[in-house]
């Protein structure tokens, strides 16, 4: 079984979740296998709404927040697929997602850097729990959030590529291309859409090395 862990946060979820969730459902992902991890709140809360699991988190470590919550709360699934809230999916996504070689521990979206996105075996996540929990952040000050955003640049794929064993690349396909320069969310932030062949996945990005200042806007 694969459960989908969507990484979002208190500032962006109202704009991003309608797009990513509707795309997952359209491509045949069962509602009960979708978990939303919404970071940056003062207290924890959990609800099931329209069959989808919503975790309101009392911490914010960007895209690592779902992994932190999974190992901390011991949310079981054979595999967890971690995806950003700024993604959409094509018609082959589910078939490609479920194409997991026997014995696979980690499958990355593509070569490093892969934005931490990919599928992790639950038992493996528990085995590196201490490393995951070491980056749990509860300080929401501007200084702290900027610190962790900057920390994430050299430490991208902290668990996927920077922690043994090395992952497989999904469907042995590391190809990607820039699809367009659209902003899906109707804001003035400069964004571009990248397409990843390995999972028939589209990612709408605001940071791709085009600026020395990392954006924290939608």
Descriptions of predicted regions:
Residues 1-218:
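ER/Golgi luminal nucleotide-sugar-dependent glycosyltransferases, focusing on the catalytic module
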């Amino acid at each position: 079984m694969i459960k989908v862990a969507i990484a979002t946060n208190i500032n962006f979820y109202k704009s991003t979740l309608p797009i990513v969730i509707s795309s997952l459902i359209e491509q045949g992902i069962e509602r009960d296998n979708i978990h939303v991890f919404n970071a940056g709140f003062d207290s924890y809360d959990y609800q099931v709404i329209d069959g989808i699991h919503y975790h309101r988190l009392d911490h914010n470590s960007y895209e690592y927040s779902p992994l932190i919550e999974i190992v901390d709360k011991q949310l079981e699934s054979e595999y967890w697929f971690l995806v950003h809230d700024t993604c959409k999916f094509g018609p082959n996504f589910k078939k490609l997602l479920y194409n997991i070689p026997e014995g696979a521990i980690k499958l990355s979206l593509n070569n490093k850097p892969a934005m931490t996105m990919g599928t992790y075996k639950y038992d493996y996540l528990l085995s590196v729990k201490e490393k995951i929990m070491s980056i749990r952040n509860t300080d929401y000050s501007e200084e702290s959030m900027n610190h962790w955003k900057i920390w994430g640049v050299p430490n991208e794929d902290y668990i996927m590529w920077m922690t043994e064993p090395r992952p497989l690349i999904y469907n042995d396909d590391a190809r990607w291309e820039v699809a367009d320069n659209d902003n899906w969310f109707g804001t003035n932030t400069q964004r571009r859409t990248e397409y990843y062949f390995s999972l028939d996945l589209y990612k709408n990005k605001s940071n791709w090395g085009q600026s020395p200042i990392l954006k924290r806007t939608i």
